């Protein structure tokens, strides 16, 4: 597979924060973490989708919602905060994940149906027929909205969820392994910008010229590097997902 650098008008909102189907039970998250002068922030998440931005307060705000098996196992989701030297480390875990019951999820068009066991699913098939889109596993819908102080060096690692950046003032490094990165940037306030993927694409409508001097495109690897204005450094990487660079 060969990845492509694509310059396009990005007018379609991504579906990472829009979910079709009936409402599910969920638990709200609300946590704050103080940040001292000179500290940096490191975050590591597995399943959550993350929306991150900056604000003027000297603290980190972590909000969002958790739904695990329609609210039945929300208490398994934990946010962990540790400090090491000048670094604040934030991560999540799903406690006793191997013990959480799996569900059968069936998709019919835009409708999502969840069955607790095979007997329920087979009964549904008797009257509705078989579906080609069936998944078995824990039903998880976890979305985090995080605000960090402006101009604080921040690093995020996400495994399965997308990382969305509607606005960010300060040095930022994002690695979203499978979910991809969607960043909105004000070009004049961006210093060095680096975007990288292995099996996805890089899409942008920023005023940046793509040439052999600032881009490398090979089988299974695409890298773009540019200096757009004056400001902090941004690095966005998604080995298996897409990177979207939007003009703000």
Predicted features along the sequence, with ranges:
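Short linear S-[DN]-x-LW-Φ motif typified by the pepsin-like aspartic protease active-site region
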Residues: 26-84, 153, 165, 183-185, ...
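Residue-level detector of short, conserved catalytic/binding motifs and their immediate flanks
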Residues: 39, 172, 193
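Short acidic/polar alpha-helix capping motifs at helix-coil junctions
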Residues: 2-3, 42, 155-158
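Internal hydrophobic scaffold segments of catalytic domains
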Residues: 67-104, 182-198
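Solvent-exposed coil/turn segments that connect beta secondary-structure elements
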Residues: 46, 55-58, 65-67, 84-86, ...
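Bacterial Sec-dependent N-terminal signal peptides
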Residues: 1-29
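Right-handed parallel beta-helix
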Residues: 31-36, 79-171, 221-238, 242-248
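Short, surface-exposed interaction patches in beta-rich subdomains
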Residues: 28, 61-63, 71, 167, ...
